[in-house]
Amino acid sequence: MKRDYGGVGTIALRASALLKAMSQDIEDQRKEFNQTEYYQTFTRNAVAKLPKLSRRIVEQAIKEMEDDGYQFNKKQVGNVEQYALTIQNVIDIYAHRKIPKYRDIYKSPYVIFVVNLKGGVSKTVSTVTLAHALRVHQDLLRHDLRILVIDLDPQASSTMFLDHTHSIGSILETAAQAMLNDLDAETLRKEVIRPTIVPGVDVIPASIDDGFVASQWKELVEEHLPGQNQYEILRRNIIDRVADDYDFIFIDTGPHLDPFLLNGLAASDLLLTPTPPAQVDFHSTLKYLTRLPEMLEQLEEEGVEPRLSASIGFMSKMTGKRDHETSHSLAREVYASNILDSSLPRLDGFERCGESFDTVISANPQSYPGSAEALKKARTEAERFTKAVFDRIEFVRGEAA
């Protein structure tokens, strides 16, 4: 800039410094209290209660695996060393028992787009919560679900929740840049895809600069990817190339109709529409639903054949208020059988997790800034919601088979 324009430049510098400081503070605290890894572990008795397992099965599997040289995670309790089985330990026990994994049943990943043109409807929170919860839900551990979140929202909110060190400033290895640069699978794995604190859940980050890419998308595709359809880039250049690595792939875009959202629609198998009950949000969601056929028609006119097999709505930010229940009833009229029985309620836990750049699944109760009971309640609701989504996906895929 030629000048400060009444403090614009100065404020930007301060904001950048504060963002970096906030991120560094969180990182320093995690390192200080040894919380840089996912916290949840299981006792042998807890694992024995999981589906398709029993105490005798678990004890026998552990013995056989240790005899073969496998090392289980343990912790010191006083003078005694006890098993503290990690998510991976449990998955390996299932594998030792030859329980089929999800990838043994379905060879290709299922692409899920949580989408709404209204901002502030819990779209990102729903996405990242589902991503983490699908991986660690106790009823789903036997499936060894591998999850990828592709963040195409320049606000990078999903990136903040899943990998906060890459959610500030400008970064080159974003989903938008990867789409344009036509990277091979190995380069995507090594340079673009980032792990999250929950092993088995990865993210491709977004950056504020991606907004400029979206605004010039058609011209950039013509320049860098001649001959490719501008609305099939996400599917062809990212999803298809890492398809063997994941069971579920989530897409997160901003709440505006742009080429990223249309790429998301073109690439998706399932649309999930968060539907808040507040009057203004509910009204805006209905307007989005009326526009959705036009967007799909636009893709068809551009030579794209959408892959959608289902469009499911669910209530977000629900409370027990009477007007919220009224909105829920109206939503049932609109979605009919295409609405989830489970909703994502408005709870303190979902909101406060952002203070430590966590989801309600990844947040460690020992360092969570709010009430441990509130976090537990939010996690319980998140797990119930996640199981409902998984069960609906199984129903949809079963019908299509």
What are these regions (language model features)?
Residues 1-104:
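Long, basic/Gly/Ser/Thr-rich N-terminal segments
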Residues 108-155:
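Walker A/P-loop phosphate-binding motif and the immediately C-terminal alpha-helix
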Residues 185-198, 203-260:
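Cytosolic-facing regulatory segments adjacent to core modules
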Residues 353-379, 385:
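C-terminal boundary of histidine-terminating zinc-finger modules
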